[in-house]
Amino acid sequence: MARSIWKGPFVDLHLLRKAEGAQDSGARAPIKTWSRRSTILPQFVGLTFNVYNGRKFVPVSVSEEMVGHKLGEFAPTRYFPGHADKKGKR
């Protein structure tokens, strides 16, 4: 079920403050975050976030198409190496 419209999008307050500070100062350094659950807002466009995937920080550059999605959607947590090839099928 989707989040109710009257509540608005969820963004961790500390992340919102860091993003606003980076926009005001014009800093190009990536913002390090563990908050995969935060929604990407229009004011995040152009910023780079280092999102933790459980093992390392994955750089995520925010573009217009990402607005409304969660930060965690762009930092995969699982690695799929592919299915093994069959020995008889070459």
UniProtKB/Swiss-Prot annotation:
One of its GO terms (cellular component) is small ribosomal subunit. It holds the Pfam family Ribosomal_S19. It comes from the Bacteria. Gene3D superfamilies: 30s Ribosomal Protein S19, Chain A (3.30.860.10). Disulfide bonds: none annotated. Keywords: Ribonucleoprotein, Ribosomal protein, RNA-binding, rRNA-binding. GO terms for biological process: ribosomal small subunit assembly; translation. GO terms for molecular function: rRNA binding; structural constituent of ribosome. InterPro entries: Ribosomal_uS19, Ribosomal_uS19_bac-type, Ribosomal_uS19_CS, Ribosomal_uS19_SF. Belongs to the universal ribosomal protein uS19 family. Protein S19 forms a complex with S13 that binds strongly to the 16S ribosomal RNA. This is Small ribosomal subunit protein uS19. It comes from Rhizorhabdus wittichii (strain DSM 6014 / CCUG 31198 / JCM 15750 / NBRC 105917 / EY 4224 / RW1).
